[in-house]
């Protein structure tokens, strides 16, 4: 999100390993080649933070999701400012984009990105208005530990916006570990 709002990779000193992995397989590798050297070893895939490594990066601010209050508290104790962005709906993400626009002194770019989000959402809603009544059941697996995108995840929104039904929609929270038996009971049509 910082890159999208700022239009540059120059202010990014660290990113989550999953963001780094996505970067490796995306057009951002061409658009922002310097991100290849950005540190991602200060946090693991489960968002467990090595605070000593964060301090070595000397960030001006750390952007975290709102479900990480203990991380914000520890960063504050270390004198490192943290900004929490609410994770969940597209509106939450858009509010986070707006906040980053203020922090990065790029409010116009933030509003343009939000406008793009809203236009994209409207496009998919219109396209899916006449979708088939039997929506495919889609299961989004995060990792080999059978962690699924639940009803509070952005992935839930993406699945429904594109005409699917989240097979794990009845799970609590954003990400939930489940059993193979649960997956078999859900009988998803598509697994991502």
Give the residues covered by each predicted segment:
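A short, structured surface patch at a secondary-structure boundary
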Residues: 2-55, 61
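Extracytoplasmic substrate-binding proteins
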Residues: 71-147, 165-172, 177, 186
């Amino acid at each position: 999100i910082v890159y999208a709002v700022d239009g540059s990779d120059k202010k990014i000193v660290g990113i989550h390993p999953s963001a780094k992995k996505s970067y490796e397989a995306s057009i951002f590798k061409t658009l922002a080649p310097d991100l290849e050297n950005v540190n991602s070893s200060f946090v693991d895939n489960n968002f467990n933070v090595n605070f000593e490594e964060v301090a070595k990066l000397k960030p001006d601010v750390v952007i975290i999701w709102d479900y990480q209050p203990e991380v914000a508290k520890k960063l504050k104790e270390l004198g490192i400012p943290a900004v929490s962005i609410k994770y969940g709906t597209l509106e939450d993400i858009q509010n986070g984009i707006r906040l980053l626009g203020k922090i990065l002194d790029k409010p116009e770019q933030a509003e343009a990105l939000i406008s793009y989000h809203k236009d994209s959402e409207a496009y998919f809603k219109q396209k899916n208005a006449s979708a088939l009544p039997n929506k495919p059941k889609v299961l989004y697996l995060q990792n080999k530990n059978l962690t699924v995108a639940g009803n509070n995840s952005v992935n839930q929104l993406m699945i429904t916006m594109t005409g699917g039904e989240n097979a794990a929609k009845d799970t609590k929270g954003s990400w939930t570990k489940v059993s193979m038996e649960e997956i078999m009971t859900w009988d998803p049509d598509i697994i991502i």
